[in-house]
Amino acid sequence: MGNNFWSTWSPSQRIFSLIWPATILYLIMKLLIEKMWGKNRGAVERFQTRREALFDDFKSRSAPASLVNNPRIVKGNETAEQIETTFNEILKLDLIALKSALQTDKYNAYTVLCAFVWRAIDVNSEINCITEVIREAFNTAEALDDNYAQTGEKGQLFGLPFSVKSNFYMENYDVTVGLAKLLEQPKTTTCPMVQFLSDQGAVPFCLTNVPQGLLSYVSSNPIYGTTKNPWDFSRTPGGSSGGEAALLAAGGAAFGIGSDLAGSLRIPAAFCGLVTLKPTQDRLCVTDTHGGLPGRGRLGLSFGFYTRSVKEQEFLLGLIVGRSEYLELCPMSSPAKLEKHIEKDQKLVIGWFVDDGFNPVVPSNRRAVEETVKSLQAKGHQVVELKLADVSEEFPPFAVADMLFRNVMPDNGAYMSEMYAGEQYDEHMKLFIRLVCLKQNFLVSFLLRYGVMPFAKLALSKRLACIGSAYNSDLAACRQNQENTDSYKLQWIRYWKSKKIDALICPSFITPAQPFEYPAQLSNGAFITGLFNMLDVPAGVVPVSPVNQKDVDQLIDGFSTEGDLLLKKQREAARGTTGLPNAVQVVTLPNCEEMCLRVMRLVEESAEGVQRLQWRVGASAAPIDVENTPAGVVSSLEHFERVNLLH
């Protein structure tokens, strides 16, 4: 009888009968989410009110006009104009020069902090990179100066203001990672990395923005908003350490600290023109942070610094890695100190590739590697082209990509779905979050893997199909993937040894900085960075010559999309990138950070045309060609000058 009843319905009635229950279910779920978000809305509003009040307070306390006659400002600065001139002098110094000026009493900690706060608040008003200021910063600087006056002693980082990625625990501060449910739950401890740097005399003065839940390379969330790239305000600085990179690139901190689970330090460094190094996980272990994926698979979680030069990286890493004082705070970290290489004239064997076998890179990023390799070869170093397909017959590149994405979500997204439950989804991450939440459902994942994704592989994108079908069906599959990962690591090292190379140079990412809407659509980009977390090897990023117009022109004829939807999106994301930072990635074997830094220095010395942003003081020396310049770049040029670096 039921079948006869169904047969009397028209096709449109049948379709409607299937759609309306799904619609009602969607509306119920939407109502539940909005109700839960409403429960946290009060906390969000209270926080945002406090945040703006503290920004105003810091702006007032650091304004040159308010510091006239302040006895803590270094002598010789009696007027607001003199103080502003001194601030600009301070802000033009690199980290090593600023350290020297502080150690030799040219400046004191309080004056330097005021200079950086003054600049950081202005920068933040344009690019929204700071989530919160650290209330104790001025008291900390005053205490440093007072202690020096009494004892004559200074720590190695005396008075250097630094920024902190907001997933690092700091006592009495929330760690929300952009999730409203985590507001008003201040931490009771400070992470050992921040504590060690503070013990050495550095001054943490602000926390910086991250993606909602950390797991993206667009630094945006409903609590703190979207962070803009200081080179182009219409593009992301990357993520998840995007707020850190944006602030440092804009000159708002002496240095910054961040974490890296699948490229979270390296992608922002590449997008913002900075230097960073992701160490082997245990070489610099850091506890008391939100790692993004507690209980993750075989992925090395690393911590490191953002600087403007390799020399600054060497200084900061040399200060903390293997130091007994740091081991007291974090005993799990390796006791092996960073050694200095003496044999600087020794010629090296450098491996390289431009295609990882999974996802091609756009012409600008390919050229960055090819020019760097050619320059090193001209200086007498031997270069050897590598092919990732030759690493393992058992695991070709697409199988390695599947391995990586299973390691990212060993529980098929269950933890991430719980993390996002009841949250308002960020506008730039909606697609990513919805796909993650869908994937943890067994039935949906089964349909995706055996129904939708085989079709997608043929009709849309084999890369999308690979990502969508990366699923651990049960505990046995999860265990097998971890065994495969361990096996691939060994095969990687054997392949490396067979080529007798000292280091590897490869693309830093698949594109330069992308518009905000693309990271959620281009998870395929994470392979070129996440691979080295899965292998748990040192990987650094060094800026090279910026993107040029020829690179952009070649997107049409020099970058094949293969009819692949994701590659088409990738090409779109790379349009209009002329003048933006470009970079290469340097990789070595596990625990060989010293060699990685050495090759990074060689790359830095061979790079030409690298630029640095500098906050504009006074009118622009040259008019901006508004008609032929992207709007986001125009906004950047109104506030920042581009200064050529000389090595």
Swiss-Prot record:
Pfam families cross-referenced by the UniProt entry: Amidase
What EC class does the entry list? hydrolase
Superkingdom of the source?
Eukaryota
InterPro entries, per database record: Amidase_CS (IPR020556), Amidase_dom (IPR023631), AS_sf (IPR036928), Endocannabinoid_amidase (IPR052096)
Alphabetically list the UniProt keywords: Hydrolase, Lipid degradation, Lipid metabolism, Serine esterase
Catalyzed reactions per annotation: Hydrolyzes glycerol monoesters of long-chain fatty acids; N-(5Z,8Z,11Z,14Z-eicosatetraenoyl)-ethanolamine + H2O = ethanolamine + (5Z,8Z,11Z,14Z)-eicosatetraenoate; 2-(5Z,8Z,11Z,14Z-eicosatetraenoyl)-glycerol + H2O = glycerol + (5Z,8Z,11Z,14Z)-eicosatetraenoate + H(+)
Could you state one GO biological process linked to this protein?
Answer: fatty acid catabolic process
Q: Where is the active site?
A: K165, S240, S264
- Entry GO MF terms: amidase activity; fatty acid amide hydrolase activity; monoacylglycerol lipase activity
Do you know which Gene3D superfamilies this protein is assigned to? Amidase signature (AS) domain (3.90.1300.10)
Listed transmembrane segments: none
How is this protein activated or inhibited?
Answer: Inhibited by the benzodioxole 4-[bis(1,3-benzodioxol-5-yl)-hydroxymethyl]-1-piperidinecarboxylic acid (4-nitrophenyl) ester (JZL184).
Q: What is its EC number?
A: 3.1.1.23, 3.5.1.99
Assigned protein family: Belongs to the amidase family.
What exactly does this protein do? Converts monoacylglycerides to free fatty acids and glycerol. Hydrolyzes the endocannabinoid 2-arachidonoylglycerol (2-AG), and thereby regulates the degradation of endocannabinoid-related monoacylglycerides. Also hydrolyzes arachidonoyl ethanolamide (anandamide, or AEA), but with low efficiency. Plays a role in the regulation of longevity and resistance to oxidative stress.
Protein name stated in the entry? Monoglyceride lipase faah-4
Lineage at the top is: Eukaryota, Metazoa, Ecdysozoa, Nematoda, Chromadorea
